[in-house]
Design a protein with these regions (language model features):
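Conserved beta-loop-beta/alpha segment of the NTase-like Rossmann-fold superfamily
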Residues: 69, 77-80, 94-176, 212-214, ...
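Catalytic-core segments of class I nucleotidyltransferases/pyrophosphorylases
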Residues: 131, 150, 154, 181-284
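Well-ordered alpha-helical segments embedded in enzymatic catalytic cores
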Residues: 40-43, 116-120, 236
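N-terminal glycine-rich phosphate-binding loop and ensuing alpha1 helix
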Residues: 2-86, 144-148
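Conserved beta-strand scaffold positions in the cores of enzyme catalytic domains, especially
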Residues: 32, 103-105, 159, 246-248, ...
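Structural beta-sheet core signal
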Residues: 12, 58, 132, 161-162, ...
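Short, conserved catalytic or adaptor-binding loops enriched in Gly and charged residues
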Residues: 91-102, 180-182, 239-241
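Residues at the starts of beta-strands that form the adenosine-phosphate
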Residues: 9, 54-56, 102, 129, ...
């Protein structure tokens, strides 16, 4: 096969209301919730950039201006830090995005689901393959999940979904795929959105990472409203299966479901224990609390 076009564009659907974290998300998006000293969306962006993406498309909603501000220049803050000789902090602020990376913000006028959010990015993505990253799913890995999946795409030219095995009782929270061996990969045979455990084709779940060919856009235009009355990306992918191979990639790394309170707290613990400024003292603090009856 000819060498496929490299993945240069990443789409971040960030228009959700974050109701699980109210009232914290009443005026601030859930993607700006911090894990130690960086917001979730920054971890997602860093993963995309590390995979070679240089064009970042944020599909936003109301109350999402802080995401745009976070990735914009902050002249007053930089001047203040420079005057106070806080060079380390100044470097952190200036280096949030490499100079060759550009950001585009598109408003999703109605909350019509993940498939609709991806469709909103069509004009920005054009006729190129692209990544979709859900910031709720924080993945800690030596090589980012999108970089791993981009390598599979480079070898095959096919769409790739990031997957992991979940407990059968959890299938109702995910898109679930059925796979079969294909060359040295796993080809998806079917995909269904949030099935009951007894109706799930497997317990292999799609978890917030996608590399998609541009054909997905025309297919998303044809799907009606699915689960929850929304335009589901899962339904578009189900149609994509009829036209081309779609692969499942069980990425190496630990995923934290930061869309749930418990997953968010677990991520905070894990990242706090390895952060150079907090690791030692935080470990001591946890040992202290572990001795207290709960």
């Amino acid at each position: 096969m000819e060498n496929p076009v490299p993945i240069k564009k990443a789409v971040f659907p960030v228009a959700g209301m974050g109701t699980r974290f109210l009232p914290a998300t009443k005026a601030s998006p859930k993607e700006m919730l911090p894990i130690v000293d960086k917001p979730l969306i920054q971890y997602a962006v860093e993963e995309a950039v590390a995979a070679g993406c240089t064009e970042l498309v944020f599909v936003t909603g109301r109350n999402k201006r802080s995401i745009e501000d976070h990735f914009d220049k902050a002249y007053e803050l930089e001047t203040e830090l420079e005057q106070r000789h806080k060079t380390a902090l100044l470097s952190h602020v200036r280096d949030i995005l490499p100079s060759d990376v550009t950001c585009l913000y598109i408003r999703q006028a109605e909350a019509l689901g993940l498939g609709h959010a991806v469709l909103c990015a069509r004009a920005a993505v054009g006729n190129e393959p692209f990544a979709v990253i859900l910031a709720d799913d924080l993945i800690d890995a030596p090589q980012g999940a999108i970089a791993q999946m981009a390598e599979v795409y480079r070898q095959t030219g096919n769409s790739v979904l990031g997957v992991e095995t979940v407990a059968p009782s959890q299938t109702g929270s995910y898109g679930i795929v059925e796979v079969s061996p294909w060359q040295q990969y796993q080809r998806i045979q079917s995909i269904v959105e949030k099935p009951k455990p007894e109706e799930a084709p497997s317990n292999l779940a799609v978890v917030g990472r996608y590399i998609l060919t541009p054909r997905i856009f025309s297919l998303l235009q044809t799907v009606g409203r699915g689960a929850g009355g929304e335009i589901q990306l899962t339904d578009g992918i189900a149609k994509l299966l009829e036209h081309e191979p779609v692969l499942a990639h069980a990425f190496a790394g630990k995923r934290y479901d930061c869309g749930s309170k418990l997953g968010y707290l677990e991520a905070t613990l894990a990242y706090g224990l390895k952060h150079p400024e907090t690791a030692e003292a935080f470990r001591t603090l946890l040992q202290k609390y572990s001795q207290v009856e709960v």
